[in-house]
Amino acid sequence: MYVEKINQPTDVKNLNSEQLHILADEMRQALLQKLSKHGGHFGPNLGMVEATIALHYVFNSPTDKIVYDVSHQSYPHKMLTGRKDAFLYEDKYDDVSGYSNPDESDHDFFTIGHTSTSVSLACGLAKGRDLKGDSENIIAVIGDGSLSGGEALEGLDFASELNSNLIIVVNDNDMSIAENHGGLYKNLKQLRDTDGKSECNLFKSMGLDYVFVKDGNDIDSLITAFEQVKDSTYPVVVHICTQKGKGYKIAEENKENWHYCGPFNLETGKSDMSQDGGEDYSSMTADILLKKMKEDKTVVGITSATPTVFGFTEDKRKEAGSQFVDVGIAEETAVALASGIAKSGGKPVYGVYSTFIQRTYDQLSQDLCINNSPATILVYWASVYGMNDVTHLGIYDIPMMSNIPNLVYLAPTTKEEYLAMLDWSIEQNDHPVAIRVPISVVSDGKKVTKDFSKLNEYEVTQNGSKIAIVALGSFYSVGAKTAEIIENKTDVKPTLINPIYITGTDDKLLEQLKANHDVVITVEDGILDGGFGEKIARFYGNSDVKVLNYGLKKEFLDRYNPEEIVKANRLTPEQIAEDVCGIIG
């Protein structure tokens, strides 16, 4: 096998055309084997095999620098840059991450996982090169809907002013995670339909040179195009048309479902993951919103290219019709759009992953909260038990969002609480509201009668003395278990509190606790610095009450075992109880 002999990109240059095509087939088969057993980004990588081979055949990495946008399509790149074993041998599958990583190889220049950044990063590399008087090629590879992100357009706008070498490979597979949206993609389609000859050309209008490759999965055509632009002295776009999921028919016919995959049966395409048929907050939310949409034409769902985060599959998007909006990979626009809709009397609900909400801090503060627009934001996978790649952590949202004035950030502990919060948020007109959606569905069957408009009123779920445990959201269960252990060990019955509100303190209740409590414990599923617990600690700062904050320390975690991280931060009920028992004797 040729792929087994590729230890560095120079090995690719020694192959002839026929051998390069065989190499592509071998790489694709290796990817299929690994992805079927291990999971990962499927469609983007199968579509980029030939382009990656051509890039390394023509250019001289790492002297020439290649920056992959998002870098979820960098698996073929890793195979050709000394990391093939992690794709050929099952016992080495975890030796590499799913994204570019400079710690793995000199051929990776940035740790990247969020979208639309490659052009700006490449512009920086090019400017740095020019300042030093060097002459290497700088290549940005961008696709899978990333052009819809504002930073990508900002980068393109700046690129034309470089007046030096910069090669931007636009990987056009006519898809984002789901289908593409926006006028930009209409222009890409027009360019595809005219073999790049349309007079209406976004890239040329921005002052960039342009090369079109009709078959972006043909190695020979790609090599010709890349040789044409190599060592160019002016920024140029190479527009290549690829097939997402190429080489696996099931994925070619179901591109959205095969953007990412878990382990699956290679013959049938069926997932190996157990389907327990239990409830999940995503599908539950979509069903509720669809019901509301039918009853109220002002209710609208908003996504920034991740519609299934809150359950809007292709069928449900069709059912929602114009009451569902996909702005593309543009979180900033999603929040500003929601603010505008709310100001016009609409009832917008924006579903977003915790890791992506950080991309729109300014819009949360300026466009939404200063204007006090009553939009609803549903924040998913905000947990140490969420995504565990360093670029996709969901543990920073509390410090970021809970300190913005006017925003009401809620943390439900049960399904019933979540549904009540969602209903209240959509129907109220006084506040922008965010809800930190738990990962696992917990149901206690209790009817929720709380009036959430009475802000910052915590709920005491168990009265006790000496010790109070304030346990936030999904970690309420940790607090409840901790209280049980403490009572069994000491005969002290702790007070247990569900704070509900992340954004404020119940000063009246906290003041009352001073009368018969010596220790107050806070438990949260996020980082401690700037988090919920520090608000409680600040309240008791000049009192005799001792406050213990439990959460995560501030660090960039990567590919971690959540149980190990929880234990390392002394976040298990047993560890917390041990600490408390040591204090009270």
Identify the residue ranges that each predicted region occupies.
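Glycine-rich ThDP/TPP pyrophosphate-binding loop and its adjacent helix/strand module
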Residues: 108-264, 270-278, 282-287, 407-517
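Cofactor-binding active-site loop characterized by glycine-rich and histidine/acidic residues
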Residues: 41-162, 299, 304, 313-314
